Amino acid sequence: MVPGRRTRLNLTDRSTRILGMDKRTDTRQRLIDSARDLIYARSYSDVGVQEICDRAGVRKGSFYHFFPSKRDLTLAVLDQFQAFFRQEILGRAFADNLPPLQRIDRFFDYAADFQRQMKQDTGQMPGCPFGNIACEMSTQDEAIRLRVEQIMQDAEVPFEQALAEAVADGDLPGIDAAETARALFAYVEGVMVYAKTRNEPELVRQLGKRALQLVVPDRLT
């Protein structure tokens, strides 16, 4: 990479399929897909409505037919990311075919695999889309902040359920499952930022192995 030159992710067709979102002919969906790719690759502020329209092959007037503002389009993008995250990461990681604590370990494995694949396709680890936009927009746009807050709270639920099961099974000492799940997800977001900064997806897996030791120091062995 040349010093001082801005690196831009290029979300290819393959990356789009990894996200579970094939390109569609529907105009509204094309706008969502284009905004998703551009904002995830760069940032909310760095992407304008005209660029989104150009990528989608849509006239600007059509944009405002579907979305009153870039904020409204971004909320739709967040909803689409959440649907993918629920199904492809959380849903698979927390399937009950493993003991509850192993599901948490598997979450970090799946998250690392996704980030590694994105890096292979784009050259950069993009990080967590929710954490990315939270860092950028939480002090600037309350509607976006609230949506990301809701998404993150929703993501804590399978962690809480797994922890509660582990307590019931005697694999963990008595803990506040909800509070511990919140701490775990905060750790997830910190790991994602650190791994993104290092551009090393494998750090997500490596640091994930420490997660339960940090939030439950007296974890039974």
Identify the function of each model-found stretch.
Residues 3, 140-144, 152-180, 216-221:
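Hydrophobic alpha-helical bundle segments that form small-molecule/ligand-binding pockets
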Residues 114-118, 135, 140, 165, ...:
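Amphipathic C-terminal alpha-helical segment
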Residues 126-132, 175-194, 210-213:
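Hydrophobic alpha-helical segments that form the core
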Residues 76, 90-126, 181-184:
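Hydrophobic alpha-helical connector segments
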